[in-house]
A protein has these predicted regions:
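Membrane-interface alpha helices of multi-pass inner-membrane proteins
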Residues: 45-48, 124-125, 173-187
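Membrane-interface transmembrane helices that cradle and orient dolichyl/undecaprenyl
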Residues: 108-115, 154-173, 181, 201-202
Length: 205
């Protein structure tokens, strides 16, 4: 029990380290104001609580409006842009936890492979953190950063549910998954791609 508690503490500590490390890089390279493509539209509609292009992104706009109220800069675009580095860094921390879950399922978990498991997950998460697509969306006001976080969160909760499905509280994970998928449609429809993964978890795991 004590060993497992130590491993959990190490795991969550590394996730926090990943969050702050990637946030520092994303914030350092963040767009200081409005950038290209849809960002100007999202910033403007967040500020006035307007309606962007279909199918709309109401949850993203509400969060953007909240960040626009923070008195951290005179530039509204800068305030709203800050949300993307935060949520993108959180996605990387979640990815680290997801990788650990996958490795546990692929290999029998022993004390000897803890370093290998955490090391592999840490490197994999950092590698993804600085891929072009993720980094590009982590530095401007776009829906993809938050959508990626919601998708990762649904995947992580699905894995936790499958791991604890024999326990009495497993239904809580399913309720959270369904609720988050509903919220995610107010950001982007990307989250619907998790449905096949959830279905496979129901059948196979």
């Amino acid at each position: 029990m004590m060993i497992q508690k130590i491993k959990n503490n190490v795991e969550y500590t590394l996730a926090v380290v990943l969050f702050f490390l990637t946030f520092f890089v994303y914030f350092s390279t963040m767009a200081p104001t409005v950038s290209f493509w849809d960002t100007g539209e999202f910033i403007a509609t967040s500020y006035i609580l307007g309606v962007p292009h279909p199918p709309g992104n109401p949850l993203f706009l509400l969060i953007g409006k909240l960040f626009s109220l923070f008195p951290i800069s005179s530039d509204i675009a800068f305030r709203i842009n800050i949300f993307s580095p935060i949520i993108s860094a959180a996605t990387i921390a979640l990815l680290f936890l997801i990788c650990n879950q996958f490795i546990e399922r692929l290999n029998s978990y022993t004390t000897d492979n803890s370093i290998l498991k955490f090391g592999s997950s840490f490197i994999a998460s950092l590698t993804f953190a600085f891929t072009h697509s993720h980094w590009f969306n982590a530095v401007e006001a776009e829906v993809y950063a938050l959508s990626g976080f919601m998708t990762a969160l649904v995947v992580y909760l699905t894995m936790l549910w499958s791991k604890n499905r024999q326990k009495s509280y497993h239904i809580i994970y399913l309720i959270m998954i369904v609720y988050l998928m509903g919220l995610a449609t107010g950001i982007h429809l990307l989250n619907l791609l998790t449905i096949p993964f959830i279905a496979l978890s129901l059948i196979h795991i």
